[in-house]
């Protein structure tokens, strides 16, 4: 068994929508990033890479490489999961926490779970996504950006 933890943050800027958890969420601003700025999938990639001792997303998909400019984070997640399987592991479960004052995530949570479960080749009940606010405190509370944490449990493939 292996456990991994990931964290990511992006600030708001430009035009919406926000891409998060593999889902397009309507909002007046987007997230500033080299790729599509999907903080949930970036945190999940970091958690998976950490669990297999393969560093972080920046090591594998550096923002200094134009190859990854505007990259679809679902494609990055699938590539990371391929690495997980090559190391002899599969997902036990994933738990993702989105921290945002806005936009409202609740209407999109199920679609996020569906996308993540598909990309990680797992059953829906192995994936949990939830959202919370920071009670109007800090940069997320001031609606300056979105943060996300993810935890994964990997088990040996049978």
UniProtKB/Swiss-Prot annotation:
From the UniProt record, list the coiled-coil ranges.
Answer: none
What residue stretch is flagged as signal peptide?
none
The cofactors required by this protein are: a divalent metal cation
The record's comment on cofactor binding reads: Binds 1 divalent metal cation per subunit.
A molecular function annotated in GO for this UniProt entry is: metal ion binding
Which residues are listed for 4-CDP-2-C-methyl-D-erythritol 2-phosphate binding in this entry? Answer: 8-10, 34-35, 56-58, 61-65, 100-106, 132-135, 139, 142
Catalysed reactions, semicolon-separated: 4-CDP-2-C-methyl-D-erythritol 2-phosphate = 2-C-methyl-D-erythritol 2,4-cyclic diphosphate + CMP
Q: Which Pfam families match?
A: YgbB
Pathway it belongs to? Isoprenoid biosynthesis; isopentenyl diphosphate biosynthesis via DXP pathway; isopentenyl diphosphate from 1-deoxy-D-xylulose 5-phosphate: step 4/6
* Top-rank taxon: Bacteria
Question: Location of site Transition state stabilizer?
Answer: 34, 133
Does Repressor count among this protein's keywords? Answer: no
Tell me which EC number(s) this protein carries: 4.6.1.12
Q: Where does a divalent metal cation bind?
A: 8, 10, 42
Sorted alphabetically, the keyword list is: Isoprene biosynthesis, Lyase, Metal-binding
Q: Can you tell me which family this protein belongs to?
A: Belongs to the IspF family.
- Quaternary structure and interacting proteins, as annotated: Homotrimer.
**What is the protein name given in its UniProt record?**
2-C-methyl-D-erythritol 2,4-cyclodiphosphate synthase
Q: Which organism is it from?
A: Aliivibrio fischeri (strain MJ11) (Vibrio fischeri)
